[in-house]
Regions:
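Catalytic domains that recognize anionic headgroups
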Residues: 1-187
């Protein structure tokens, strides 16, 4: 398990200078008039995360006979002064779609696919399914073929044909309260 600090403000501090592809990227001022710099720095941090994940996959791929998998999911999205509300960061009192819609990635080695073809195929079938980060625990345990009685549920695993696409989804608001999603008016 790897934990990436990822794309958290101040974004320009989240990547080496050689990944400063989008310029200018000095995101020290939070204001609509500096949005281009914020976006550039944020995009550079995403570019670096992509590089990190690609290098990790290449490392795993180099262990050709090893059953390995990589599962990545951002813990939250960011508001980047995206509309007239001029919201910035995350965990605002009124959550936005920008904060909740995040990237995810699953990769499986050839050896893993040979050993567990159904799990890799289920991951493809569930790739566009609505899910929350709550599914990560169950998915990781299922990838590792860990069974745990009542605590591990394949209905919450993205590598299972039992994954329940219709299950209610919730997110935590700024008071750490579970709120059903989708919610009317969320944009």
């Amino acid at each position: 398990i790897l934990h990436c600090y990822g794309s958290h403000f101040s974004y320009h501090q989240r990547y080496p200078r050689e990944f400063a592809r989008f310029l200018p990227d000095d995101d020290v001022a939070i204001a609509a008039k500096h949005r281009d710099k914020l976006l550039n720095a944020y995009d550079n941090s995403v570019l670096y995360t992509d590089h990190f994940l690609a290098r990790t996959i290449e490392y795993l791929r180099g262990m050709s006979d090893t059953r390995s998998a990589l599962l990545y999911c951002a813990d939250h999205g960011e508001d980047l002064i995206d509309d007239e509300r001029e919201r910035f960061l995350h965990a605002s009192p009124t959550t936005t779609a920008w904060q909740l819609h995040v990237a995810g990635l699953a990769w499986f080695s050839d050896a893993y696919r040979r050993e567990f073809p159904g799990k890799a195929e289920a991951a493809l079938r569930n790739a566009a399914a609505p899910a929350t980060t709550h599914a990560m625990f169950h998915t990781m345990a299922d990838i590792a073929s860990i069974r745990g009685g009542e605590y591990l549920r394949t209905s919450v695993s993205l590598v299972s044909d039992d994954f329940d696409r219709t299950a209610p989804r919730c997110y935590l608001n700024d008071h750490n309260e579970a709120v059903p999603y989708p919610r009317s008016g969320l944009r």
